[in-house]
């Protein structure tokens, strides 16, 4: 099953997450099919969250499931989008 979840990057104490579409059997930071966005929780200026909505819609259309954290981030991105 394909799942859209966070893959951790960055250094110690400075997390950075890629939002990726991957097979659910792969490791958290392992092989993925496609990167659909990123989330930087420690960003002070600049962009902290970007999601390619067209690719997210595509993956959901072919049956991909969102992890609970990605669901929360998608809602956050949709709230911020009309204001921008």
From Swiss-Prot:
GO molecular function: structural constituent of ribosome
InterPro entries: Ribosomal_bS16, Ribosomal_bS16_dom_sf
Domain of life of the source: Bacteria
One CC-aspect GO term: cytoplasm
Pfam family, one: Ribosomal_S16
Keyword annotations from UniProtKB, A to Z: Ribonucleoprotein, Ribosomal protein
GO biological process: one example: translation
Protein family according to the UniProt entry: Belongs to the bacterial ribosomal protein bS16 family.
Protein name: Small ribosomal subunit protein bS16
């Amino acid at each position: 099953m394909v799942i859209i979840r966070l893959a951790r990057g960055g250094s110690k104490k400075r997390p950075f997450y890629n939002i990726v579409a991957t097979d659910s059997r792969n490791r958290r930071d392992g092989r993925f099919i496609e990167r659909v966005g990123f989330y930087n929780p420690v960003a002070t200026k600049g962009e902290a969250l970007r999601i390619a909505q067209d690719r997210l819609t595509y993956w959901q259309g072919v049956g991909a499931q969102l992890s609970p954290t990605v669901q929360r981030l998608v809602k956050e991105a949709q709230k911020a989008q009309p204001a921008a």
